[in-house]
From Swiss-Prot:
Its EC number is 3.5.99.6. HAMAP family: GlcN6P_deamin (MF_01241). Catalyzes the reversible isomerization-deamination of glucosamine 6-phosphate (GlcN6P) to form fructose 6-phosphate (Fru6P) and ammonium ion. Coiled coil: none annotated. This is Glucosamine-6-phosphate deaminase. The keyword NAD does not apply. CDD domains: GlcN6P_deaminase (cd01399). GO terms for cellular component: cytoplasm. The active site is at D62 (proton acceptor), N128 (for ring-opening step), H130 (proton acceptor), E135 (for ring-opening step). Belongs to the glucosamine/galactosamine-6-phosphate isomerase family. NagB subfamily. GO terms for molecular function: glucosamine-6-phosphate deaminase activity; identical protein binding.
Amino acid sequence: MKIIRVQDQLEGGKVAFSLLKESLAEGATTLGLATGSTPITFYQELVNSDLDCSALTSINLDEYVGLPVENDQSYDYFMRDQLFNAKPFKESFLPNGLADDLEAEVKRYDQVIAEHPIDFQILGIGRNGHIGFNEPGTPFAEKTHVVDLQASTIEANSRFFASIDDVPKQAISMGIASIMASKMIVLLAFGKEKAAAIKGMVSGPVTEALPASVLQQHDHVVVIVDEAAASELD
C-alpha cells in the first residue's frame, strides 16, 4: 500500500489522473468508478484533458435503490453530469436501482464485472471505513449485493437531500471481493473526518468491522490523502 500525501483535493485529483494515464499506457481498458464528493476533482481532470474515452468501459461501484435516474441524487445522474456527458465511454455500467427483481439485478451485475475485469478502480472511504456501500460487517467474500445502509451513512449522505427522510435506505453495491479483484486500486480521502478510517485501513487489523482494511491484502493500492485525512498516520 503506497501512501501519497497531497496539499488538497485539487492536487489529489491531479495525482489520481496521472496514475490513470500510466495505467492506460500499460493497456488498461476498464475503469471502476465511484461517486460522491471525493472523486470530483479526478473527474474534472479527466474532463479537462484531451483523453479520448470512447474505447474505454466503466463500471460503477453502486447505486441507490428506488431513485429514478433523472433524480439529481442518483449515481446515474451524477456520472452523466460529472463525466459521461463530456467524455462518453464505449460502455458504462451502473447497477439498476429500479429493477423489479433486485436479486436478478445483483446476478446481472456480477456477470458484467466477470466479463469486464476492472483494471483501475477509484475508491473513496466512508467515515466508518466502508468502501462502495460495503458497510462494517460485510463479509470479505461478498460480491454484488443489496445493502441496508447504516444510520451513519444515511446521515452523512443527508446533506445532499432536502430531508434525511428522503435519503434511500438501500443500495446495490459491488462487493468487497469484486473490488479486490481489480488490478489496481486508487483510494482518495480528504478531510479530518476521514482520518480515523484511514488510520484503521492502513495500520489497523484486517477486520470486517472496517471494510477498507482488506485493502492491506491487495498487491497494488495507492492511497491519496490530504494532511487532514493523514493526520492520524505515523
